[in-house]
Regions:
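Phosphate-group recognition and catalysis centered on beta-loop-alpha active-site segments
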Residues: 2-5, 9-22, 26-286
Length: 286
């Protein structure tokens, strides 16, 4: 496929952007959103599966969104499995172009008046090295949009890209002196030589590390392990996220989220945007 230029993509996107940026009166984004702080610890797992990718998460004030990508030719297509890919659903069309337009409209930030970057977690589903190198070429077209790391020094931008998924992406990333993306580490990376300037986030599968799923009492040994993990990461300037936590609304999910909150986890992983928003608001967590 021919690679669509940023200018062409933005021109095509502009026809619909105005409607997206000005949702109907009464929506959270149009009315209440501007008066309520973003929920920086809220992470939209598989965000692209919502009716309005990116914008549904922003409507619920989320601070992090996740997009799975496949390298097909020179295009980065967004989807969970290869058989559901649509050539029209690219990383540019669903995320990069809308974010660029939002940041321009909001004078340098995704959420107007809040300078903290939005996290874009990009989960690579195809071979990591080649996909990352193509992704890097795409990211270069968006000057001044992203947090960068130049020679070990981090320069904040409106959007921070964090690369997850296939671990082979690490090799070309480590070879770069200037990056527009950061690495999503695993618990096995804690305490290694990877600094927070390379791996600011540590994510792992909850159910491969803990047995408790929110019912009954949280075993004390597991609670101490959780707090130890978070403390170790925070001491190195890294943030922590767990995926595969219970996500069915009910007491078990609330109990587990409460333990994560008490332990100081940095991102709550969910498909239920409204449910997590309500939980964090009830606990007055930004």
């Amino acid at each position: 496929m021919a690679l669509v230029t940023r200018r062409t993509a933005l021109t095509a996107f502009g026809a619909t952007l105005a409607a997206v940026l000005a949702p109907p009166a009464g929506s959270a984004f149009a009315d209440d959103h501007k008066h309520r702080a973003p929920l920086w610890r809220a992470h939209a797992h598989n965000d692209y599966e919502h009716p309005r990718p990116l914008f549904d998460a922003l409507d619920h004030r989320f601070g992090s969104v996740e997009a799975d990508i496949f390298l097909v030719g020179d295009q980065l297509l967004v989807g969970h499995t290869a058989d559901e890919l649509d050539p029209k659903r690219t990383l540019e069309s669903l995320y990069l172009d809308p974010l660029a337009a939002l940041v321009k409209a909001n004078h340098g930030s995704v959420y107007r008046g809040y300078r903290r970057p939005l996290q874009l977690l990009i989960d690579i589903k195809t071979e990591g090295s080649s996909t990352y190198l193509e992704l890097d070429r795409h990211l270069r077209r968006y000057q001044h949009l992203f947090t960068t790391c130049a020679h070990g020094r981090v320069h904040p931008g409106a959007v921070t890209n964090v690369i997850s998924g296939d671990r082979a992406a690490r090799i070309p990333m480590e070879a770069q002196s200037v990056r527009r993306a950061f690495y999503d580490g695993r618990l096995t990376d804690l305490g290694t030589s990877a600094p927070a300037s390379f791996a600011p986030l540590v994510s792992d599968n909850w159910q491969l590390n803990f047995t408790w799923l929110g019912e009954g009492t949280f075993p004390d040994a597991e609670r101490q392990r959780l707090r130890g993990i978070i403390g170790q990461a925070h001491a190195r300037g890294q943030k922590v996220r767990f995926w595969n936590t219970p996500d069915l609304a009910g007491p078990a999910r609330d109990a587990l989220w409460a333990e994560l909150l008490d332990a100081g986890v940095d991102y709550f992983n969910t498909d239920d945007l409204a449910g997590l928003e309500a939980f964090l608001d009830a606990h007055r967590v930004a």
